[in-house]
Every structure is written in C-alpha cells, then in structure tokens.
C-alpha cells in the first residue's frame, strides 16, 4: 500500500492477506482481522515459514486475516526517512491507510490485534483519533506505563537518545533479539516515554494520550502473561484498566487455569499457545464477526 500520507512519498506498507487454498477471488473470506507484530520482528511472528501460527489458525476458523508489517520490516521497504520513523507516524498515517484499504477490499472494517509494540501502535492510533470505525481490537503484552529504572537517573534518557540517534538504528540480529532492525525514532520514542518524567504522548505535538485512552469506546481484549518479564502482567493490566471503553482481560497463568505461566513470546508462539490461547482469541473475535 503506497498511501502518500504524511511526510515522505517513499512510504510503502506491506499487507499480506492469508487465505485457504481453493478460495476464489472475490469470495467472502469472513470477518477481517489485522495482526501487527512487535519490535525487531516481522509477519513471521504470526505465521512461521512452515505456514503455522496464530494467523493460519484464525484463517482456519473462518477469518479473513491480514498481516501488517512496519516500515522497513519484512516485505515493507525502507522509506527514505527510515531513521526518523516513529510509532506516531505508523499510527497517524500507515494504520489508517491499511484500515481503509482492507475495507475497500473486503467490504468490512477489520479488527486489529497487536503484540507488544504492535499493540502500542494500535493504541496510539485509537487514542490519537487517527483510526475510526473499528469493531474491536486486542493487545498482547502491551503497556506504556512501566518506568524503566535505568532511565530514572537524571540525564540518562537524553544521553541514551543521543547515542541511539548517532547509531540511526538498532540491529536486532546483532543484539540477538530478533531478525529486524528498529529505527532511532521508534527507540527514542520509547526512551522518552519511559524516562524520568516521561509520558505517553504524540512527539509531534506533545499531546498526552492517556486522557484520550480513558475516553475511547472501541471494545478491547487485553491479554497479559503471568511470566512476562519484558512487559510484566501488572503493568499491562494497569494500562488495560485505564481504558475507558468496553474491555475484557485475560491473564495467561497457572492461577487462571492455564498449564503454565506464559511469557512475552510464547503467549503467541508455540504448541501451548496453539492449544490454550489461540482458541480464546478466536472465540472473542467471533462475537464481533456479524
């Protein structure tokens, strides 16, 4: 999708539509659902090279599944201003363009599901008022309220942001945390938000987003994992409970009847997630599929 929205005409976003073999062009594929990956990864988070993942499962359950990839990730090419990409730009320009494109193709507005940073992008689009007509959205291991203790020291945040800006991007393979890079703009947004006196806001205007989060009305499924050390459950739950619209929460842990305390990645990926988590997500989506 080349949407020509916002600064820079070079932006193109890859949207991959997943379907069952034998489905004819134009045939009703069911209720559309968009999956948004987190940082340092791509659509492979939802669909493995062997064709298995939450994406293929939801297709089998009758949903019309689309995979959204951030700028410069997977099949989305790098734009000319790659190092200055931000969550705000994704939320303000890319998600609304994809939302409208899917509506044009399917005749329905999709539900959006995001993991970690993917959830933050969706939450920013909703709180910023950039994307409307959503039937529902879900977030997995997403929060914007946990203070990063290393960044609470005065000047730690500005120094870290200066170093990241100098590097222009962080290499996920070099850091052994994923197959993709992240631009300085996205990293610095995170550092500013979680530093001393930081808050969730739009960098371009300084507008605080939590007040709008508290007044939003789209139905939310907030999923947290009891064993998550990246975005701990208590912070995800705190963020979800601030939301003003209809919401359901799901804590993936032994105390709630699950086989284990799920963690940040295996809440989505693996046989345990396939058996215990994916069906819950499918059932929740089914309520909005009419």
Which residues fall in each region the model found?
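Catalytic active-site module of serine/aspartate enzymes centered on a nucleophile-bearing elbow/loop
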Residues: 248-290
């Amino acid at each position: 999708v080349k949407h020509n929205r916002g600064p820079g005409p070079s932006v193109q976003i890859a949207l991959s539509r997943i379907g069952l073999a034998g489905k004819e062009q134009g045939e009703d594929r069911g209720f559309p659902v968009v999956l948004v990956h987190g940082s340092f990864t791509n659509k492979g988070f939802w669909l493995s090279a062997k064709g298995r993942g939450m994406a293929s499962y939801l297709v089998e359950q009758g949903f019309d599944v689309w995979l959204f990839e951030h700028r410069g990730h997977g099949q989305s090419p790098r734009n000319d201003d790659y190092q200055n990409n931000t969550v705000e730009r994704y939320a303000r320009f890319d998600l609304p363009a994809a939302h409208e494109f899917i509506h044009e193709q399917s005749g329905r507005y999709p539900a959006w599901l995001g993991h970690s940073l993917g959830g933050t992008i969706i939450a920013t689009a909703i709180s910023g008022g950039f994307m409307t007509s959503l039937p529902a959205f879900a977030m997995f291991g997403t929060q914007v309220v946990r203070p990063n203790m290393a960044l609470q020291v005065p000047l730690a945040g500005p120094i870290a942001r200066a170093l990241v800006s100098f590097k222009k991007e962080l290499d996920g393979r070099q850091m052994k945390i994923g197959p993709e890079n992240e631009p300085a703009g996205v990293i610095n947004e995170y550092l500013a938000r979680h530093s001393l006196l930081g808050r969730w806001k739009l960098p371009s205007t300084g507008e605080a987003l939590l007040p709008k989060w508290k007044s939003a009305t789209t139905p939310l499924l907030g999923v947290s994992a009891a064993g998550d050390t990246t975005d701990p459950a208590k912070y995800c739950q705190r963020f979800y409970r601030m939301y003003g619209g209809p919401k359901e929460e799901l804590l993936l842990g032994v105390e709630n009847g699950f086989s284990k305390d799920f963690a940040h990645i295996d809440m989505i990926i693996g046989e345990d997630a396939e058996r215990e988590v994916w069906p819950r997500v499918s059932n929740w989506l089914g309520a909005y599929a009419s």
